[in-house]
Every structure is written in structure tokens, then in C-alpha cells.
Amino acid sequence: MGKVEILIIESVTPCEQCRKAEAIANELAKKYEGVTVRVINVLDPEADKFGVVMTPTVVVNGVIISVRRAPDPERLERLIKNRLGGV
């Protein structure tokens, strides 16, 4: 079984979309074993690797999947299932 890391890069003061992205990711992490969620601030040096200029930015296994809004829950779930090996 694969592993999935969801990285949410939030604004200094998390906005509504940041909080929504975090809630969606955490809900899916509870549903699927092997999924982890990390949340960092846009000022974190790690955010520089992705060239983040707008938040939230949602990254799955190193690939940006959503910018400036929470990801679509169904799309994120399909991506997770695919990365986990078709759970």
C-alpha cells in the first residue's frame, strides 16, 4: 500500500479556504490509512520550494493540486485512492 502526504500551506492568519482545506484533508486522513496531513505557514522556508504566492496551496506527494481555494473533496479522494493503490 502506498502513502500519501497532504501538505497544506496556509496564510499567516488562516483564511476560510485554508480552514476548509485543512478540514477536508483531515477527514480523508481519518478515512484512509497511510494518509498524513501537515500544515505549514506560507512563511515557512518549505513553502518556498513550491513558489507559493496564494493560499491555501494544497500539495499531494510533492505535487500542487489546488491553489487559492480548498480542493474539491471528491477529486482529492480519487487522487488519494489512486496513490494508495486503488483502495
Where do the language-model regions lie?
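Local sequence-structure signature of Cys/Sec-based thiol-disulfide redox active-site neighborhoods
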Residues: 1-27
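Conserved N-terminal glycine/acidic-rich loop preference
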Residues: 1-6, 49-61
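Glycine-/small-residue-rich active-site loops that bind phosphorylated ligands and cofactors
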Residues: 13-16, 47, 65
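Short, glycine/charged-enriched secondary-structure capping and boundary segments
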Residues: 21-23, 52-55, 73-74
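Conserved helix-turn-beta segment immediately C-terminal to the redox Cys motif
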Residues: 22-40
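Thioredoxin-like thiol-disulfide oxidoreductase module
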Residues: 36-54
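Non-catalytic, surface beta->alpha helical segment in thiol-disulfide oxidoreductase systems
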Residues: 61-87
